[in-house]
Amino acid sequence: MPLFSRPAKKATHLFFATDVHGSERTFRKFINAGKFYKADVIVMGGDIIGKMAIPIIREADGHYRATLQGTQQHIETEAELDKLTERIGILGFYSKIMDEDEYRALAADESAVDAMFHELARARLESWLELAETRLAGTGIKCYITGGNDDYPDVLEALNKSGTESVLACESKVIDIDGQHTMASLGASTPTPWNTPREVTDEELGSMIEALVEQVDDPSRCIFNFHDPPVDSTLDTCPMLDWTTDPPSQIVKAGQVVLYGAGSKSVRQAIETHQPLLGLHGHIHESPGIMKIGRTVCANPGSEYAEGILHGVLVNLADGKVQSYQLTSG
């Protein structure tokens, strides 16, 4: 009698990156990574908007000036202006050209500054979504994007645009990514010294996680795409900061910067309890790596967005198992 075996399930190639913080070059690399790595699914794990807006002031003589990273820039030609705006975009900042009167009025109105920032952030995110739809059209690659703790809810609303084929919102959802595996996504984080828009207590984060996991049929086939990494996992190691100074300063003892695990206890507890297939994390830029908590492979690719470098992790999944994984950089 011939022997029969179950046909092997097709592997799913997943590419994950995070914390691009508005960087035009880094996000474009992320979208192109799908084809480059022959991925079926690409996931952007949060902190997608930039950190500041740079006014470019049009002077009476037709020249421009701007202050970037503490240095005043004097621009005389359109070519120089294009080069400056490109550099600002690579750094993850936004820019807006304005005359002296508009600049003075803006400087005197904090609410107007906030409104301008949100408008610029949403416009860039919308342009990214259009770019992704164009680049991924016809490839079969699915792109999932979630926010992080730095991302304002009103800006993230752009992700909920209907009618998209390749780019799909996944925040606070459990989604089927390939017919074999699901992904649960959360972008909030525990408190930071910077009082970012989407911070919650560790206890609140734990409640959010458990409410989401209740929707998961089989955690062993689920990816936990949680922006905050598990505490004391080597994926969350960073300098300890003094929150009483402005800006927060590194704590030094015996001439050495004090390092600690800044991740979430609730994220770690959820992974230990539910033992998902895979944990995808970010938030702590300087702590890239891959480790295991029980059976669960956990990864944080890290981030050097301001240099235009895309760090990622490429994972091959099949039939509820992680077949292979590799950190990438480019």
Regions found by a protein language model. Name each.
Residues K142-Y144, L168, T182, R221-I223, ...:
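Proline-centered loop/turn at the N-terminus of a beta-strand
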Residues P2-F4, G22, V174-Q180, T196, ...:
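Binuclear metal-dependent phosphoesterase catalytic core
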Residues A11-H21, Q180-T192, I223-H227, V297-S303, ...:
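Active-site-proximal beta-strand elements of phosphoester/diester hydrolases
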Residues G179-I223, D242-W243, Y260-G263:
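Binuclear metal-dependent hydrolase catalytic cores centered on His/Asp/Glu-rich metal-binding motifs
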